[in-house]
């Protein structure tokens, strides 16, 4: 049975008030605070109907009502249907990020989102397999130290510090740069492994002393580029919500954030736009009292990761949907600009 305009107005009033106060609301309060144009008695009857239809709940013996997950879902769907981003773009100085690693850029944006929303944010860094190494660069920082820089064909940057057992002059660095880019750049994983295991030591000749460091670092970079990394920020914000003054609930929330494999599944993108999962809609028991708003970020149109906001079902969905949308658009634009030449 579809909701008529009267029921919609009352449902939205209950949700709006509960988001702000965390307290059940009664018909008299709605009549006084919200310009619905209905008497308290009429509102009371409509609220009883909404409860019977599953959109509202009556906690314990309270005279007031609170939204159910079904009520939140109706509210969120109406937001997403009518969603227009009227907020100005977030101004952000990208100069520092351009020299940062990919995952550090994403972490910084997740931190900003947590600070803006006062909610816990989680970010999923990409699993890049089967991406290939596009470029390797060895940068000397001392005669016995160098930075090993890896750039993938999606522009992801990883760097490692190598400590060498002997001093190496710059001509050797140039030789190694040319050799590794010739033999590894653009090759698939199988060819890279074969080169490392069968050919590298022979090609290094008198420089074989550097072989173990190079082989171990290249293998480590390949392994890490195939792993999904999960980052969380603003974890303490959950304690600002009255629902989580209960220490056992707070403990369960922090245990959830420690479960990286579970967060990985929670952040798995299911739609190409903003995805909202409310309370009981989540398939994991640990998320039954929580909602997650998640969306993907991209490099030149290609999805490379996910960012989400996790909090109580009593969250300001309209505000948070707008903020995560603006932030991920900014992040996608920045990443696309930085890595445009690398793809």
Curated annotation (Swiss-Prot):
<dbReference type="InterPro" id="IPR036390">
    <property type="entry name" value="WH_DNA-bd_sf"/>
</dbReference>
<dbReference type="InterPro" id="IPR029016">
    <property type="entry name" value="GAF-like_dom_sf"/>
</dbReference>
<protein>
    <recommendedName>
        <fullName>Heat-inducible transcription repressor HrcA</fullName>
    </recommendedName>
</protein>
<dbReference type="GO" id="GO:0003677">
    <property type="term" value="F:DNA binding"/>
</dbReference>
<keyword id="KW-0805">Transcription regulation</keyword>
<comment type="similarity">
    <text>Belongs to the HrcA family.</text>
</comment>
<dbReference type="InterPro" id="IPR023120">
    <property type="entry name" value="WHTH_transcript_rep_HrcA_IDD"/>
</dbReference>
<dbReference type="Pfam" id="PF01628">
    <property type="entry name" value="HrcA"/>
</dbReference>
<dbReference type="GO" id="GO:0045892">
    <property type="term" value="P:negative regulation of DNA-templated transcription"/>
</dbReference>
<keyword id="KW-0678">Repressor</keyword>
<dbReference type="InterPro" id="IPR021153">
    <property type="entry name" value="HrcA_C"/>
</dbReference>
<dbReference type="InterPro" id="IPR002571">
    <property type="entry name" value="HrcA"/>
</dbReference>
<keyword id="KW-0804">Transcription</keyword>
<keyword id="KW-0346">Stress response</keyword>
<comment type="function">
    <text>Negative regulator of class I heat shock genes (grpE-dnaK-dnaJ and groELS operons). Prevents heat-shock induction of these operons.</text>
</comment>
<dbReference type="InterPro" id="IPR036388">
    <property type="entry name" value="WH-like_DNA-bd_sf"/>
</dbReference>
